[in-house]
Amino acid sequence: MSQFLDEIKVRRSVYAISKEEVISDQRVEEIVAEAVLHTPSSFNSQSARVVVLFGEQHDKLWDITKETLRAIVPADSFGPTEEKMAAFRSGRGTVLFFEDQEVIQGLQEQFALYKDNFPVWSEQSSGMLQFVIWTALANEGVGASLQHYNPLIDEKVQQEWNIPASWKLIAQMPFGKPVAEPGEKPFNPIESRLKVFK
């Protein structure tokens, strides 16, 4: 089995994380930068935009998310939501994934035949970037999971970190030192998911 496939297997959703340093913050920045540069995008659009939050900035994101959810989740059932936010906040940092809609709209105008496809391709490209960063972090011992509290938090995130209006929030990836093993991952039979014709 190739090294790359082995590295893919290391990536799991890790929810129990702490602020303790596994790799330096600078190393996290290097991983994210390399991933942003080298993850493919349709028409080489390079529409991905990423923000990395550490320390108090990371904490602030999950405080914002908690208070945003508090306003819409019934008080008598808010407990589990609050616990989940606390778990994400317990991590060392968060990667925020965006897609620049100005780039996408420019491609739609330039290649009108594919107009309806560009938003879909943009999401697919973002998914690849998320996977690359997630897998790279996992292989350096960093636990992470992928969250989607957009569009509920979009406006407040934009205001707090002065995010350009054209950047559409796609996903949030809290990360940190794993403090518990992920549960066993069940697999459906590969025969039901893969067909080969020769």
Question: Where do the language-model regions lie?
Answer:
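Short glycine-enriched loops at secondary-structure junctions
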Residues: 99-103
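C-terminal helix-cap and adjacent tail motif
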Residues: 6-10, 14-16, 169-198
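N-terminal amphipathic, basic helical "cap/leader" segment at the start of enzyme domains
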Residues: 1-93, 197-198
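C-terminal edge-of-domain segments
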Residues: 90, 95, 175-177
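Short, surface-exposed, charged loop/turn segments at secondary-structure junctions
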Residues: 66-67, 109-117, 187
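Small-aliphatic-rich amphipathic alpha-helix that forms the alpha element of a beta-alpha
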Residues: 35-36, 111-159
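Short proline/glycine-enriched turn/loop segments at secondary-structure junctions
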Residues: 158-165, 182-186
